Amino acid sequence: EPFQGEGGVNIPETHYLQGLRELCSQNDWLLMLDEVQSGVGRSGRWFAFQHSHIVPDVVTLAKGLGGGVPIGACLAKGAAAEVFQPGNHASTFGGNPLACNAALETLAVISDEGLLDHVVKLGDFLRNQFNRQLAGQKGVMQVRGQGLITGIELSIPCTDLVKRALEKKLLINVTSDRVIRLLPAFVMQQSEAEQIVDILCPLIKEFLNN
C-alpha cells in the first residue's frame, strides 16, 4: 500500500516508494501497489503513488472506483501487462456494464467537479484543526494523514470512541487499537468538516481525561 489504512494510517516518506521503485528496477522485479483504499482521489491525487513521483508496474483498485457500486480493477504496464493472455484468467462478472458505467461516471464527476482540490483543502483543514484543538492534550500522540484520510493516534486503546461518536451521530473507525481513522466522503462540505471537529475533539479530550 502507498500508505497503510488498516495498519494505522501510516504515510511513508517520499523516498520510501522511490527506494522501492529503484530496488525493483535494478533487480528486474515488479513493483505492485495496492491502491484499493488510497486510489481514485482519496489522497488528493488520482493515485497515492503520485505523491512520490514514481510509476509502479501493477496497481489494484476497488472501493472508490465505482462510487458505491462494487467494482475492482487491476492496472498493469510494460511486461506486467503481458503476463495474462486472452483466456488465461476469467471473471464471472468481469466487465459488468452497470459497474463499468458507474466507474466511468465516478471518474468524470471527480474530474469535472474539481474534487481532487476539494479533497486536499478539506483534509488539510481537518488535520490543522485537530492539531490546534488537541495541542497539549495528554495522550494524543500524533495527527497524520493525506487528502481525506486522517488518523489520530492516542496513547491507549480507544475502540470505545466508536460507540461514543455514533451516539453523537458521527461515524468513525479505530484501527490498530489506538488510531482513530476518518475517511469522509469526497463531497463533504466545509460546514460538515467543522462538525466533525466540534464533535470529535471534545470526545477525545473527555476520553483521555477520565
Language-model segments: residues:
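Conserved N-terminal phosphate-binding loop of PLP-dependent enzymes in the Aspartate aminotransferase
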Residues: 1-210
